[in-house]
Amino acid sequence: MSDPKLLAISGSLRAGSFNTMLLKTAVAAFGPADVTYGDIRFPLYDGDLETAEGIPAAVQTLHDQMQAADAIIIATPEYNGNLSGVLKNALDWVSRAKPMPMNDTPLAIMSATGGRTGGVMTQNSLRQCLTPFQPHVLQGPAVAVAMASTVFDEHGALTDERYQKAVQKLMDKLRSRV
């Protein structure tokens, strides 16, 4: 049996992103897999652009990766209580490509933030944004890494044992759904 296809998406474009670090931790915890990191560097969604030029190639690529994935992980920062604009924009674009991707695909959400809540509000916001796609969003255990600058080392490794355990439990659950 071949390794499952795992799509990993960071909702942050920032170099040194804590969410990208968290995502890499999760991918390692998931275990053997054919891993793809989704790229969400798209132009802002614009219906006129879509009408004039169609679905951008980068959007179609992410759509196809979502369609092919056996499981998906999304790590998102929290900006003003919501998911990042780039992640929301990516979901808006991908929803325009057909067929609708992620239907029935097991999906894990996680977040890392500089604040004390770890991104709980952004996870709720992301769940709402995913509703039209109808993935099987795992309901826990929650991975909401608070005070992220204090729990990753200079190499991007997650050093807090309680968060490491939460990531492992979530990835074990995700893998069991594949």
Each model region followed by its residue ranges:
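Short, glycine-/small-residue-rich phosphate/pyrophosphate-handling segment
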Residues: N103-M147, R162
